[in-house]
Curated annotation (Swiss-Prot):
Consists of an N-terminal domain, which is sufficient for the localization to the septal ring and is required for cell division, followed by a linker domain, and a C-terminal domain, which forms the translocation motor involved in chromosome segregation. The C-terminal domain can be further subdivided into alpha, beta and gamma subdomains. The alpha and beta subdomains form the DNA pump, and the gamma subdomain is a regulatory subdomain. Pfam families: FtsK_alpha, FtsK_gamma, FtsK_SpoIIIE. Homohexamer. Forms a ring that surrounds DNA. PANTHER family: DNA TRANSLOCASE FTSK (PTHR22683:SF41), SPORULATION PROTEIN RELATED (PTHR22683). The keyword Transcription does not apply. SUPFAM superfamilies: P-loop containing nucleoside triphosphate hydrolases, Winged helix' DNA-binding domain. Residues 1-18 have a biased composition (Basic residues). The gene is ftsK. GO terms for biological process: cell division; chromosome segregation. It comes from the Bacteria. The lineage of its organism: Bacteria, Bacillati, Bacillota, Bacilli, Lactobacillales. It comes from Streptococcus agalactiae serotype III (strain NEM316). Residues 726-737 have a biased composition (Acidic residues). This is DNA translocase FtsK.
Length: 816
């Protein structure tokens, strides 16, 4: 027992484990003591006090060379501000990278000295510093120390000393960039702004040079006119007329001419008087025509065989009241081309400055939100880049290996919620890239003006039907060539920008094409969208506003297409380009000039109205034009605000392969237009999806805005130069209110041949139903229904009353 008691007494007390606060306090004390000791040691090294201070400094020099002071300062900052620096990862990383660059630069400078050139790097560096260390001196430049030598040696071996300088500079720039608050987007934006500034300066210099050339031409022309006027006055002053006979005394005139002419004018100068015709350019001919004067609108003497008779009427006699004295001084040789000046971009309102600086901060924030949102759903992605467009910003994300694409595409609603966006469109994947695009609407939509788009587009002026359509998400202007489409369907809900886009396409063509190169046929059942273009010389006929006339006008275009194909067959060419080439070759070698064929663009602003009135005729004409009109130089632009299957039928879609979809209300409408979803997520106001014939996926564009004032200015400019010259061959003529063709859907239809028989049957049985007529007369259900409608219109039977049978309003007469 005593032994047990002694054993219990010898057992010590159980030690208590320190708390976290106590451990942290102990660590803080240790850090404080360490920092204080290092500070004292580094202080002696900084001031090089005594042998100890010099030795400390030389030890640091051995590691980092002559950058010792920089690293001493960096060490002291880290000792006392390490908590703050832990939150600044980019600052620390940038400093380390910039320090590596400085070490390379210092060592490259050291070994560019003649005394160390071509010496072994590590051994020479160590010998320099160890010599000072052993002698307790600081005498020589140490470059980047042993650390700098280790980095410099492979770089100098691979890239030489000069290459090491360049790599060091790159490291320093990269380090400073990481230390700053700048982002990659800021650098890209700066480069883009600088590029735009240089381009604007170049364009301004180009305009100034053009203005100087024009001024020189004007001065030269003025001098020529003054010189010619002086010659004429000198000639008239030298002429002596016999008062009795009225004849010119040539001998005396020749004597007086030398005295009257100015000193710089000699007898061998240019002809005394040449008639100047302002409206046309004259073609060189030897002799004037010895016939009554005629004026040619173009350089065409006779039409090509088998052309329409309308094209032969190219010559107009002068009025009888023309003064003969004026005719004697006019050269009536055929004229090459009508002097027609194309409209300039100055007719359009200048661009308004756009400020999207707020979008940059929002983009940086959205990048973090996107990555965090995907991470919360267990999807590992990385945002590769972001492109700020006029209306949306496109984020290109790269999913990790093994992530299914549909997992990302199914999160559109969740992403819209996280980004507080109106809607989000996901393009999975981006065509041609191993990335997925997420399009988020901007907080402020930047309007793209027609002038801005025209100036930035790279459309070829020789391609008359190549027009700029809009700006892509990356800000680049996109153009399309209607000749390659070859037809275009434009659809979207009311107010989405459909009519503005059509006006932009028309204005683009008017900016490039003369009236003899492109002709328009415009159909506008709404009466307000295209009526502004009335009376321009590019129109074949006035803008058609009557839907019943429109179907006949389309049939006229079909007839023109057939006529052109017959002409191509007889000439032996395949398309309009080959035909016009033949015409140019013939005109170059013959005095009789022939007429090239213009391109024809048919524009329908509201297809739904036409389909309601005369669906069969309109659909047949559109299908025939869609199948064959491309080679004949005829192209269609069909616009509608009701993208339903009864308006855009399958046959129309098959023959109009290029489509533009503006904002629609549902995915069904989007599939009707594009055969895929996406248009229901558009923002309106010109935001569109463009799907050309040669691309499998639509491209999102922001269409240009062209105001009514801009359209009126360009139309007024064109009307001031030439008047409308309508072609009667395309005139649909007058159409009665009840005339809608055989397949229309309105008006009073023609009487069915079985109408009287059906009427007698109803009066005899005093019963009226479509099934009875179908059974008794052996007709189809559709025809029986039409007969019932005719009987109702004739007052034989009453209207339908739900499930009740129709009332027979007439009774049979004894004769019946």
């Amino acid at each position: 027992m005593v032994f047990m008691a002694n054993k219990k007494k010898t057992k010590g007390k159980k030690t208590r484990r320190p708390t976290k606060a106590e451990i942290e306090r102990q660590r803080a004390i240790q850090r404080m003591i360490t920092a204080l000791v290092l500070t004292i040691i580094l202080f002696f090294g900084i001031i090089r006090l005594g042998i100890f201070g010099i030795t400390v400094y030389n030890v640091i020099r051995f590691m980092v060379g002559s950058l010792a002071y920089l690293f001493i300062a960096a060490t002291l900052i880290y000792l006392y501000f390490f908590k703050w620096l832990r939150k600044k990862d980019s600052l620390v990383a940038g400093f380390l990278i910039a320090s590596l660059g400085l070490l390379i630069e210092w060592h490259a400078y050291l070994f560019s000295m003649p005394i160390l050139k071509d010496k072994e790097i590590l051994r020479s560096t160590a010998r320099l510093i160890v010599s000072d260390l052993m002698q307790f001196k600081i005498t020589v430049f140490a470059g980047g120390g042993m650390l700098g030598a280790l980095i410099y040696k492979p770089i100098a071996f691979l890239f030489s000393n000069i290459g090491a300088y360049m790599i060091g500079v790159l490291f320093i720039i990269l380090g400073l960039f990481l230390m700053s608050s700048l982002e990659v987007y800021d650098i890209v934006e700066f480069i883009r702004a600088f590029k735009n500034k240089v381009a604007e300066k170049h364009e301004q210099n180009k305009k100034e040079r053009f203005a100087k050339r024009e001024m020189k031409k004007a001065i030269a022309e003025q001098e020529r006119i003054e010189r010619q006027k002086a010659e004429e006055e000198a000639y008239l002053a030298s002429v002596n007329v016999d008062p009795e006979t009225g004849e010119i005394l040539e001998d005396q005139a020749e004597d007086n001419l030398d005295d009257a002419l100015p000193p710089e004018v000699s007898e061998t100068s240019t002809p005394v008087f040449e008639p100047e015709i302002l409206a046309y350019e004259t073609s060189p001919q030897n002799d004037p025509l010895p016939v009554e004067p005629t004026i040619y609108l173009e350089d065409y003497d006779s039409p090509i065989p088998n052309m329409r008779e309308n094209d032969e009427e190219m010559v107009y006699d002068l009025d009888d009241d023309v003064d003969d004295s004026d005719i004697e001084n006019v050269d009536f040789t055929p004229k090459t081309t009508l002097v027609y000046k194309l409209p300039t971009i100055d007719l359009f309102a200048p661009d308004k400055p756009k400020n999207q600086s707020k979008e940059k901060d929002l983009v940086r924030k959205n990048i973090r939100v996107l990555e965090e949102t995907f991470r919360s759903f267990g999807i590992d992605v990385k945002v590769e880049r972001a492109e700020i467009g006029p209306s949306v910003t496109k984020y290109e994300i790269k999913p990790a290996v093994g992530v299914r694409v549909n997992r990302i595409s199914n999160l559109s609603d969740d992403l819209a919620l996280a980004l507080a966006a109106k809607d989000v469109r996901i393009e999975a994947p981006i065509p041609g890239k191993s990335l997925i695009g997420i399009e988020v609407p901007n907080s402020e939509i930047a309007t793209v003006s027609f002038r801005e788009l025209w100036e930035q587009s790279d459309a070829n002026p020789e391609n008359l039907l190549e027009v700029p359509l809009g700006k892509a998400v990356n800000g680049n202007a996109r153009s399309f060539n209607l000749a390659r489409m070859p037809h275009l369907l434009v659809a979207g809900s009311t107010g989405s920008g459909k009519s503005v886009a059509v006006n932009g396409i028309i204005s683009s063509i008017l900016m490039k094409a003369r009236p003899d190169q492109v002709k328009f046929m415009m159909i506008d059942p709404k009466m307000v969208e295209l009526s502004v273009y009335n009376d321009i010389p590019h129109l074949l006929i006035p803008v058609v506003t009557n839907p019943r006339k429109a179907s006949k006008a389309l049939q006229k275009v079909v007839d023109e297409m057939e006529n052109r194909y017959e002409l191509f067959s007889k000439i032996g060419v395949r398309n309009i380009a080959g035909y016009n080439t033949k015409v140019e070759e013939f005109n170059a070698s013959s005095e009789q000039k022939q007429i090239p064929l213009p391109l024809i663009v048919v524009i329908v602003d509201e297809l739904a109205d036409l389909m309601m009135v005369a669906s069969k005729e309109v659909e047949d004409a559109i299908i025939r034009l869609g199948q064959k009109a491309r080679a004949a130089g005829i192209h269609m632009i069909l616009a509608t605000q009701r993208p339903s299957v009864d308006v855009i039928s399958g046959l129309i879609k098959a023959n109009v392969p290029s489509r533009i979809a503006f904002a629609v209300s549902s995915g069904t409408d989007s599939r009707t237009i594009l055969d895929e979803n996406g248009a229901e997520k558009l923002l309106g106001r010109g935001d569109m999806l463009f799907k050309p014939i040669d691309e499998n996926h639509p491209v999102r564009l922001q269409g240009s805005f062209i105001s009514d004032d801009d359209v009126e200015r360009i139309v007024g400019f064109i009307k001031d130069q030439a008047e409308a010259d309508y072609d009667d061959a395309f005139d649909p003529g007058e159409v009665s209110e009840t005339d809608n063709g055989s397949g229309g859907g309105g008006g009073v239809p023609e009487s069915d041949p079985l109408f009287e028989e059906a009427k007698g049957l109803v009066l005899e049985t005093q019963k009226a139903s479509a099934s009875m007529i179908q059974r008794r007369l052996s007709v189809g259900f559709n025809r029986a229904t039409r007969l019932m409608e005719e009987l109702e219109a004739a007052g034989v039977i009453g209207p339908a009353e739900g499930t009740k049978p129709r009332k027979v309003l007439m009774t049979p007469t004894p004769s019946e």
